[in-house]
Swiss-Prot record:
Subunit structure: The 20S proteasome core is composed of 14 alpha and 14 beta subunits that assemble into four stacked heptameric rings, resulting in a barrel-shaped structure. The two inner rings, each composed of seven catalytic beta subunits, are sandwiched by two outer rings, each composed of seven alpha subunits. The catalytic chamber with the active sites is on the inside of the barrel. Has a gated structure, the ends of the cylinder being occluded by the N-termini of the alpha-subunits. Is capped by the proteasome-associated ATPase, ARC.
Protein function: Component of the proteasome core, a large protease complex with broad specificity involved in protein degradation.
Protein name: Proteasome subunit beta 1
Organism from which the protein derives: Streptomyces avermitilis (strain ATCC 31267 / DSM 46492 / JCM 5070 / NBRC 14893 / NCIMB 12804 / NRRL 8165 / MA-4680)
Subcellular compartments: Cytoplasm
Gene: prcB1
UniProt-annotated catalytic positions: T55 (nucleophile)
């Protein structure tokens, strides 16, 4: 176990050569800090109505990069556990992660992933490639497989701006299964309980070369459709002024859209739904 010596200095393990993975360091010296490593007792499964779960997140590539968004609802069974949960987080300057699944484990995984990327860059002197970032996150998901099989799954969605990609291909999207299998997606993807409805909406609305405004509206429309058919997904809450989180990554780095911009776009979308409740149709 990592500890300080009696003189208040760091222990020898902090100066022992090893790889650049902070997760591997914790596993070797402080495994108790890795919440995704433990298993429930044999035969015990998590009760879904006792643990908050995040629901729908999505991403789509657009003209200047990639957009990632998520609704704000967390549920415990048929109860709303939280109305303003933030499921979209920057991982570093050019990468972001959103999650669906068990909230407590997901938030721990996101924080550890942020440290993992920063630690690698400090040790190696260069940032990871985007593919390596996806592989590293896949490994962290795989470490949670035991708990996932007992009902405590975390399913993240990773997006990044690939500085080394060809023009028009900078925005990249990766999804994962509960075993840690990484899958690069083309154009758009969604995860969580409302994802079938969100993907259906994005199939209608997505087109190459979308502007930031078009991409943001498409994401909001998709989340609205998901909330319309999936009770675990939250739509825009006009009365409480709680709206989806929408962020973009471009050559300038990660940016979360201001609340005022997201609110204006959400209100515009809801107003359009007054005359067309099922939302816009696909362009012919």
């Amino acid at each position: 176990m990592a500890q300080r010596d009696t003189g208040g200095r760091l222990g020898a393990e902090f100066f022992t050569p090893g790889d650049s993975s902070f997760t591997a360091f914790l596993a070797a010296h402080r495994p108790a800090l890795l919440s995704t490593r433990g298993l429930l007792p044999d035969g015990v499964r998590a009760a879904p109505d006792r643990v908050p779960h995040g629901t729908t997140v999505l991403a789509l590539a657009y003209r200047d990069g990639v957009l990632i968004a998520g609704d704000r609802r967390a549920t415990m069974g048929n109860l709303i556990a939280q109305r303003d949960l933030e499921k979209v987080h920057p991982a570093d300057d050019y990468t972001a992660v959103a999650f669906a699944g068990t909230v407590g484990l997901a938030l721990d995984m996101v924080k550890l992933y942020q440290v993992e990327l920063a630690h690698f860059e400090k040790v190696e002197g260069v940032p990871m490639t985007l593919r390596a970032k996806a592989t590293r996150l896949a490994g962290m998901i795989r470490q949670n497989l035991g708990q996932a099989m007992q009902g405590l799954a975390v399913v993240p969605l990773l997006v990044g701006y690939d500085l080394a990609a060809r023009a028009g291909e900078h925005g990249r999207i990766f999804s994962f299964d509960v075993t840690g299998g990484p899958y690069e997606k083309t154009d758009f993807h969604a995860e969580g309980s409302g994802s079938p409805y969100a993907r259906g909406a994005l199939k209608k609305l997505f087109h190459p070369g979308m502007s930031r405004r078009e991409a943001a509206l498409a994401a909001l429309q998709a989340l609205y459709d998901a909330a319309d058919d999936d009770s675990a997904t939250g739509g825009p809450d006009i009365s409480r002024r709680i709206f989806p989180v929408v962020s973009v990554i471009t050559e300038d780095g990660f940016e979360r859209l201001p609340e005022s911009e997201t609110e204006d776009l959400s209100r515009e979308m809801v107003e359009q739904r007054h005359t067309r409740p099922d939302g816009p149709t696909a362009a012919m």
